[in-house]
Regions:
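Charge-rich, well-structured scaffold segments of protease-associated domains
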Residues: 29-170
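Active/ligand-binding-proximal structured segments within catalytic/core domains
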Residues: 1-34
Length: 170
C-alpha cells in the first residue's frame, strides 16, 4: 500500500533482495546460517506489510536476531543479485498471474474494484513496472520503510522478556 505510483511490486522485490547480502554478509549467507542452526525461515509480502520469520531454538536466538538486524540496517546486495532477483520476481509473476486465468481475473477485479486506492495494484507488481525496477528504487523504499519505528518484533517461546528486549536493543 506504501509503494510509490509506478513502482508496483517494489515491496515484494525488496523482500527477495533481503536475502541477497549485506555490507558484512554474502548473498545467501543469511539462509545458510539460519539453516545451519536447524531453523526454518521465510518471508512474504501482503498488501499492508512484509513479514520475515524464523523458527529457531532459543540458543540461536541471539545469532538470528543479529543477522536480522544486519539485513534491516545494512542491505547491500551485489549488482548481479539485484538484476537476477528482479528476473526471479518477473518469472514469479508469469507463473502465478500471467499463466493463471483465475489469478488474472482477481487481479483485474481488484484493479477495477479499488481503482485509485493502492490495493488496485497487485502485490507482485504490474509487468511493465517490474521490468523498470532497479536498486535505486528498492534502496529508496528500503531507506524509507525499513526503519525501527516502522517494525514490529514478535518473539515467542521459552525465554525471558527482559532477555529479548536486551537482544533487540543490541
Amino acid at each position: 500500500v506504501d509503494e510509490p505510483q509506478g513502482r508496483s511490486g517494489i515491496a515484494h522485490y525488496l523482500e527477495h533482495l533481503m536475502f541477497k547480502g549485506t555490507k558484512t554478509t554474502d548473498p545467501g549467507e543469511f539462509s545458510r546460517t539460519v539453516k545451519s542452526f536447524g531453523a526454518e525461515h521465510n518471508a512474504f509480502t501482503s498488501r499492508d506489510y512484509t513479514a520475515y520469520f524464523e523458527t529457531v531454538a532459543v540458543e540461536h536466538l541471539e545469532d538470528v536476531m543479529a543477522l536480522n538486524a544486519d539485513r534491516m540496517m545494512n542491505l547491500a546486495p551485489p549488482r548481479e543479485e539485484i538484476v537476477s532477483e528482479r528476473d526471479v520476481v518477473i518469472e514469479e509473476r508469469r507463473q502465478r498471474i500471467d499463466n493463471n486465468p483465475s489469478s488474472q481475473f482477481y487481479e483485474h477485479m481488484n484493479a477495477a474494484h479499488y481503482m485509485t486506492h493502492p490495493y488496485a495494484r497487485p502485490i507482485v507488481g504490474w509487468m511493465d513496472e517490474l521490468k523498470e525496477l532497479d536498486w535505486a528504487h528498492a534502496e529508496n523504499f528500503y531507506r524509507k520503510w525499513y526503519v525501527p519505528n516502522n517494525m514490529i518484533l514478535i518473539v515467542t517461546g521459552d525465554l525471558e522478556f527482559e532477555n529479548v528486549v536486551n537482544l533487540a536493543q543490541k
